[in-house]
C-alpha cells in the first residue's frame, strides 16, 4: 500500500465501508463527515478506485453516486459488519475522522461477529433512505419456524 497521510487513509476506509455496506457512495457523505470539498471527495474516490481497489466502484447516474461492482471485496477493512456498525454508532456528532481513528491504549468491548451479507444491509439502508417498507421473516430460538 502506498504511504498515505493518516487523514487520507481514514477517508479511504470510510469510502470502502460505505460502498460495501450501503451499496451507494455519494461525495456529499464524505464532505459532511470529513469537512472536505466536493473536489477532494471525488479525488479520494478516484484514488480508491485506481490505486487500492481497481475499478471496484462505478458511477451510477440513476442513484447519483458510486456503487460497488458485483464481487466487490474490501481491501482496507476486514469486511465485517461490526466495522460498519461501529462507524455508525460512534459517529454521534463527532467528525468521522475521529470515529474511524484507532485509539492506542483504549480497549472497547467488541460486538460478536455476525454472519451478515452486505446485500441485506444495503436493502435495509435503501428502505430507510427512501421511506420504503420491507417484508421480513422472523424466527427465534424458542420458535424457530419463520413468520412475518
Task: Show where each model-derived region lies.
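Short acidic/polar, Gly/Pro-enriched loop/turn segments located at secondary-structure boundaries
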Residues: 141-143
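Short, basic/aromatic recognition patches that contact phosphate-bearing ligands
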Residues: 1-79
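Short beta-strand-centered aromatic/proline hotspots
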Residues: 147-148
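Bulky hydrophobic/aromatic content
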Residues: 68-139
Amino acid at each position: 500500500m502506498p504511504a498515505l497521510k493518516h487523514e487520507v487513509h481514514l477517508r479511504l476506509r470510510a469510502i470502502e465501508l460505505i460502498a460495501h455496506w450501503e451499496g451507494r457512495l455519494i461525495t456529499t457523505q464524505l464532505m459532511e463527515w470529513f469537512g472536505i470539498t466536493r473536489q477532494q471527495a471525488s479525488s479520494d474516490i478516484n484514488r480508491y478506485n485506481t490505486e487500492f481497489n481497481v475499478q471496484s466502484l462505478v458511477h451510477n447516474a440513476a442513484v447519483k453516486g458510486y456503487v460497488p461492482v458485483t464481487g466487490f471485496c474490501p481491501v482496507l477493512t476486514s469486511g465485517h459488519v461490526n466495522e460498519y456498525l461501529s462507524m455508525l454508532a460512534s459517529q454521534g456528532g463527532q467528525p468521522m475522522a475521529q470515529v474511524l481513528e484507532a485509539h492506542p491504549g483504549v480497549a472497547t468491548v467488541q460486538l460478536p461477529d455476525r454472519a451478515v451479507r452486505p446485500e441485506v444491509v444495503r436493502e435495509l439502508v435503501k428502505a430507510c433512505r427512501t421511506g420504503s417498507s420491507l417484508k421480513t421473516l422472523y424466527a427465534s430460538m424458542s420458535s424457530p419456524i419463520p413468520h412475518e
